[in-house]
């Protein structure tokens, strides 16, 4: 069961990482839109660019920012959104399959308790078999040691 829980956690982590990358892509690549009745607001890169060009001497050197990726066409952006949504749906379905395979889903508490008792009895039987095998191993080991010792004495 812990194996399935680990798989679910890994898949959820992958889903969240995928969503984070996709949101970053959308933030960088989304075409600006102006709501009806409002004026366009400059983006932060545009504001920084204007300030730097207006006052080239007054701005102290700033640490280099990562380069802004080249803008893509609106058609490519829409295609990327469709691909992102497909990826998210597929990953979400994988997580749902893992969750559905967890034991105890759609099983009553009484059935789970009964199953645990069955497994406990089975485990006790297997433990008895293991203990018998260990005793048998000890007897055989003693016989082998005795034979080896008798061969050593007869020389």
Curated annotation (Swiss-Prot):
A Pfam match: Med21
Gene Ontology molecular function: any one: transcription coregulator activity
Source taxonomy: Eukaryota, Fungi, Dikarya, Ascomycota, Pezizomycotina
Protein name in the entry: Mediator of RNA polymerase II transcription subunit 21
Keywords: Activator, Coiled coil, Nucleus, Transcription, Transcription regulation
UniProt-listed InterPro entries: Med7/Med21-like, Mediator_Med21
Function: Component of the Mediator complex, a coactivator involved in the regulated transcription of nearly all RNA polymerase II-dependent genes. Mediator functions as a bridge to convey information from gene-specific regulatory proteins to the basal RNA polymerase II transcription machinery. Mediator is recruited to promoters by direct interactions with regulatory proteins and serves as a scaffold for the assembly of a functional preinitiation complex with RNA polymerase II and the general transcription factors.
The protein's assembly and partners: Component of the Mediator complex.
Organism field: Phaeosphaeria nodorum (strain SN15 / ATCC MYA-4574 / FGSC 10173)
Spans annotated as Disordered: 29-73
Pro residues: bias regions: 58-69
Family to which this protein belongs: Belongs to the Mediator complex subunit 21 family.
Name of the encoding gene: SRB7
Recorded GO CC terms: mediator complex
Protein's cellular compartments: Nucleus
Coiled-coil zones: 75-147
Principal subcellular localization: nucleus
GO BP field: regulation of transcription by RNA polymerase II
Record field: compositional bias (Basic and acidic residues): 39-51
